[in-house]
């Protein structure tokens, strides 16, 4: 029951998405932001999932009809014909590159690996991840790989052949499934968001998980870490949270940003899909159900610049902003 709900939610989020390049022009108060749509006919589908830039500068665009690689001029599509063994599930959620330049592909039904030189996709046989709806892949600095999905958290060290489950429990002591987001801090902790189960910290050295028992944090959905080390938590219905000294003992402290009806510069919507920092502008970009919010002052919850969809050239094309990516050349993509 829970797995079917997770898949349905992913599908609704991505309907009608357009990939956009964003150009910023100075203005008197907030900067003017213009959205330049990428031609949709170069993609296998407009149902775009989580964007990713690899070490060679290519932008990878997972869709619900295969995977596209964009080089700034055009796109190459990878689908079922590129699989060397087995059947490639073209409902692609996420990709990530390891230190050997393998591109790992997470789909609604398992894990695949792309050889970037040959273009072949290998259907790796990982029985523990068979039919797993993979939501997040984190390639670690030691060339280990972490996988999160509707079957929980998995890990593969650099020398391992297989992935191994990492048992973690929420604040009620129940096993955590439906992992939706993972980030790593500089203290060897993983921060984990699990749908309807909350925020957890997993100490890699101790092999131990700590659950954040808080009504707002129990709605954690997506995580991000800025250049200053701040951890941001986007929730499913409770806005955005910035953790304050998260490793301190006692209850988890945070700054809460949420939508306030009638306040123009509060957060646009409390259902959050993605968070990305633009360090050059010192802003936090937040994608959600109703559009895009840009936070200009982290100490002021009323400093959001909000964007709704419009019909004019340069307007946001659609309301739901599922993925935000800052590329190494400083451009923002949604």
Annotate each predicted stretch with a short phrase.
Residues 1-334:
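Carboxylate-rich, polar loop motifs that coordinate divalent cations or form catalytic acidic clusters
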